[in-house]
């Protein structure tokens, strides 16, 4: 199991109160495969740096989770198939490096 961070940009036409329940459907992939979800942080509506699908705004959400690499790939695949998801990015956070003095 490895730690991951998922950033999702959701279509701004989706109501903000329905963002978390719809995200939860996708996050069930992680929990069903034995992974854990540490934190779901919905940033809300933000301006995009450049237009995506002719839209200048998006609803941002960041999820920290622990899962197997195959589970992370499957989650990314399922998110990319959904039309309300504009962009996804899954990264592995850098390990905290301890500096000896």
From Swiss-Prot:
SUPFAM superfamilies: Ribosomal protein S6
GO BP annotations, alphabetical order: translation
GO cellular component entries: cytoplasm; ribonucleoprotein complex; ribosome
Keyword terms of this UniProt record: Ribonucleoprotein, Ribosomal protein, RNA-binding, rRNA-binding
Stored PROSITE patterns: RIBOSOMAL_S6
A single MF term (Gene Ontology): small ribosomal subunit rRNA binding
Annotated Pfam families: Ribosomal_S6
UniProt function note: Binds together with bS18 to 16S ribosomal RNA.
Family: Belongs to the bacterial ribosomal protein bS6 family.
Name under which the protein is recorded: Small ribosomal subunit protein bS6
Origin species: Pseudarthrobacter chlorophenolicus (strain ATCC 700700 / DSM 12829 / CIP 107037 / JCM 12360 / KCTC 9906 / NCIMB 13794 / A6) (Arthrobacter chlorophenolicus)
Gene: rpsF
């Amino acid at each position: 199991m490895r730690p991951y961070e998922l950033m999702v940009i959701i279509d701004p036409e989706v109501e903000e109160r329905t963002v978390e329940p719809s995200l939860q459907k996708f996050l069930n992939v992680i929990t069903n495969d034995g992974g854990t979800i540490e934190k779901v942080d919905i940033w809300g509506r933000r301006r995009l740096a450049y237009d995506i699908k002719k839209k200048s705004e998006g609803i941002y959400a960041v999820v920290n989770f622990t899962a197997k690499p195959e589970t992370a790939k499957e989650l990314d695949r399922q998110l990319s198939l959904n039309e309300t998801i504009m962009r996804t990015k899954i990264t592995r956070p850098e390990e905290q490096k301890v500096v000896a003095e």
